[in-house]
């Protein structure tokens, strides 16, 4: 049985036929920390009467969950001067997607991606890159960089599972 490690993060663009990408196999990127997402419900309509204790709240039978930010810590190590090509021109460019070629909204496909953490067995869809924070870039007999990415999870409740392609894929 294959050992599942913290590096077992899979990503798939939300485009029909897009390949599943294993970050370690594709770009030699290891996930150092993937926290469990904080679950917070949406605010309910309330009215706070000054003459009464507490508040008057409408509590429905189903309380929806808010979208949330997910900050993941990564580590990359590779050949000398490979960081720019693999991280910035490779991985980050993959997450950003490609700009539309024109303003014809019928030709623009949905952006974002699916993400699956095999260690915690949590998968979400409609995820997009929110910020990139490089922490340490070291050039000693190769490149090493620690960085954090913050993702926005706009669909906090749909569970998805992605299967590891076990190989580097063509993007």
How would you label these PLM feature ranges?
Residues 1-171:
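Extracellular/virion structural assembly segments
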């Amino acid at each position: 049985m294959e050992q599942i490690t913290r590096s077992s993060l899979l990503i798939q663009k939300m485009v029909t036929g897009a390949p599943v990408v294993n970050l370690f196999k594709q770009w030699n990127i290891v996930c150092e920390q993937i926290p469990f997402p904080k679950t917070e419900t949406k605010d309910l309509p309330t009215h706070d009467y000054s003459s009464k204790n507490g508040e008057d709240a409408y509590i429905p039978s189903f309380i929806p969950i808010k979208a949330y930010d997910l900050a993941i810590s990564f580590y990359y190590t590779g050949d000398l001067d490979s960081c720019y090509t693999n991280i910035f021109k490779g991985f980050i460019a993959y997450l950003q997607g490609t700009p539309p070629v024109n303003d014809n909204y019928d030709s623009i496909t949905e952006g974002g991606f699916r993400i699956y953490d095999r260690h915690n067995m949590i998968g979400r869809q409609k995820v997009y890159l929110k910020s990139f924070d490089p922490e340490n870039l070291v050039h000693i007999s190769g490149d090493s960089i620690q960085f954090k990415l913050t993702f926005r999870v706009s669909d906090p409740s749909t569970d998805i599972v992605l299967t590891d392609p076990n190989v580097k894929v063509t993007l």
